Amino acid sequence: MGRKVTVAVSTLNQWALDFEGNMVRILQSILEAKDMGASYRTGPELEVCGYSCEDHFREPDTFLHSWEVLLEVMMSPMCENMLVDVGMPVMHRNVAYNCRVAFFNRQILLIRPKMAMCDDGNYRESRWFTAWTKALQTEEYVLPRMIAQHTGQQTVPFGDAVIATRDTCLGYEICEELWNVRSKHIEMSLAGVELIVNSSGSYMELRKAHITSDLIRNASFKAGGAYLFSNLRGCDGQRVYFNGCSAIALNGEILARSQQFALQDVEVTLATIDLEEIRAYRVSLRSRCTAAASAAEYPRIHCDFEMSTHSDIFKTSTPPLNWPMHTPEEEIALGPACWLWDYLRRSGQGGFFLPLSGGVDSSSSATIVHSMCRQIVQAVQQGDAQVLHDIRQLLADSDYTPDNAAGLCNRLLVTCYMGSVNSSKETRRRAAQLANQLGSYHIEISIDSAVNALLSIFNAVTGLTPRFRTQGGCARQNLALQNMQSRIRMVLAYIFAQLTLWVRNRPGGLLVLGSANVDESLRGYLTKYDCSSADINPIGGISKMDLRRFLTYAKDKFNLPVLESIIDAPPTAELEPLQENGELQQTDEADMGMTYAELSQFGRLRKQSFCGPYSMFCHLVATWKSDLSPKEVAEKVKHFFLCYAINRHKMTVLTPSVHAESYSPDDNRFDHRPFLYRPNWSWQFKAIDDEAEKLQPIYTPSSAQLRPSSEDLLISTQRSSHLDDSKHSSPLSSASASASIDVGISTAAVPLPGAAAPGGLSKKPSGYSKVHVNVLGKIKDRTGIPV
């Protein structure tokens, strides 16, 4: 009997309900694993039908076609003399389960259902599947007749069991079970299971890849053994990007791993493991041996198969490797680009159309497309036949072979500067320079004639002509004129997206790309149905601060020097008239009444730390104590929640974007909230004001901690007593917390600091009046609600 086994984990780019394509990729992974000498192959979660079938999991067809694919795979000669398992949905006694189906030589050994559902973040598994709760138990599963006719089996074990070969034993966890507080791998390892297999559907979030590697290491470190982790990769039809990182670990060290980001549809990762290393490691852990001696016994399904052979002794065991992690800037460059590629090739469209303003956001979207082109060229040069086939099909050119990113970008990306009389020469110049350096097909248009045409219609009906604020108009007129420009750009974007390839004598149309970042979506700083309304958005899950860092990285990595001037330029929508000298008088942060750094912090506290208005104030009054007084913090928090509430409706029509940030306000699934709020948050804001009133007398900005004097404490106590006397009366009856929305943002006459330079806290004594007139005036007109 041998002592070394070669095992394979598969990273697959599957597509929901693409049963034919999914089967081909599964068979390809099995063939590659077998050719490389593996005796066992596993794959990702629900690889047969695709993970993101969602409510299609309620359709009998999905189960039927999954069994049909399993039959084709199981009967394939590729699988002979190899232990294989695949992921698919299985209905058992009228309950749907997410399962692994293990088979050997055309015989099903075990159907192992998932025992812990994931309902966090973008996951909603309990909507479609039920967790198997009968620990260490199996039941008889009656096979479909079409399967029984080929295998000769009528029933197979279904439940929580492990598979014992002649030389070792393997057991299963499925995705969430690794993250679960009661992970099954500990129980299995104590029961003598040496190879623990996890099929997963884990998606990308910035700065989170290390969590998976840490969990895999720890799973094999605590009680010894080999851990085989197989994950999906790519966009299979939803907003997430499954981020690969399949890996094999042994006794706390990573032996092999797949790429996190790649265009490969199939990547097989192997490791050769010495089983005696597992046994020696485990027996050396005395506390583990004590626990194992009294561990419950797992049901074992016996398989008459040796995963190792005597000749395997000549094989070299796979040594440990270092797992370097991508920086967040690299993750932005690679992840959304791969997601765009999957979406583009599976949508049947001919490329992208991007309104390019010359600012950070649209420049980031354009740079991500350029990164996609670089990856395509690299994959083709490395001999990836599937990528070459796909790009030729997209471009309707069977002889084309991309040899440089700029040339490919010229075919795939159309950028358009949509200027107006309010646009500056600087943004026009930056957009043109970036397009030239990227290689995109660039056009410039003016929207002024369209604006004038719409205004003439309005004037013909009403006899009135709205004016900008700088021209004597009110805030309502000013906002209407800005929104009209934005919406005209959206209409023009779709016209050019549909017809540009016709102009270029190519078939098909273009996907419109959006460029609204996660912070502006959270704040609602975008016009509903403007250029933020697109087919897809590569940066919708990324913060402004991260985009700036990404462009700094891309400037050198992709040789795009113009990005430096784009990063340094103040963010602006350019929707209001320029000053007489041609310079800007409108900036985003002044319009919003908060900096992007503050907005990012608000977003993380709201989503990641589950803070409502009062909890957020309590957190920030300590975090910002060296810069802002309690009352100033209170005004900022209230301003954010007011803006969030009255703009929440915009999230219901937000353009689909790749999920990347853990505080995303994506309404589709990740962030479920009402879209009709009471915008003045009367009860919550009164709680903030009361607390700020207590803290203000003892506030010392230069202190590391609040150190109230005896006199301050006495005054604070007296004030608290006064407030306590009235605490039983409804705060709605007080002047500072009126039920009427007319109370505005503030319930205390404290100036709100204005905007500072990007990336810092804002603190200007005269800022509140500017925010109140400029920002709240726009909010009032945008929603029709007086605030």
UniProtKB/Swiss-Prot annotation:
Entry's Gene Ontology BP terms: NAD biosynthetic process; NAD biosynthetic process via the salvage pathway; negative regulation of neuromuscular synaptic transmission
Residues at which ATP binds: 355-362
Record-level Gene Ontology MF annotations: ATP binding; glutaminase activity; NAD+ synthase (glutamine-hydrolyzing) activity
EC number: 6.3.5.1
Keyword Ligase: yes
Catalyzed chemical reaction(s): deamido-NAD(+) + L-glutamine + ATP + H2O = L-glutamate + AMP + diphosphate + NAD(+) + H(+)
Start and end residues of each CN hydrolase domain: 5-275
CDD domains in the cross-refs: GAT_Gln-NAD-synth (cd07570), NAD_synthase (cd00553)
Modified residues (Phosphoserine): 703
Annotated region described as Ligase, given as residue ranges: 325-787
Pathway as given in its UniProt record: Cofactor biosynthesis; NAD(+) biosynthesis; NAD(+) from deamido-NAD(+) (L-Gln route): step 1/1
GO cellular-component term (any): cytoplasm
Top-level class of the enzyme under EC nomenclature: ligase
Protein family according to the UniProt entry: In the C-terminal section; belongs to the NAD synthetase family.
Known function: Catalyzes the ATP-dependent amidation of deamido-NAD to form NAD. Uses L-glutamine as a nitrogen source. Because of its role in energy metabolism, involved in the modulation of aged-related cardiac function, mobility, and lifespan.
Protein name per UniProt: Glutamine-dependent NAD(+) synthetase
Annotated source species: Drosophila melanogaster (Fruit fly)
Organism taxonomic ancestry: Eukaryota, Metazoa, Ecdysozoa, Arthropoda, Hexapoda
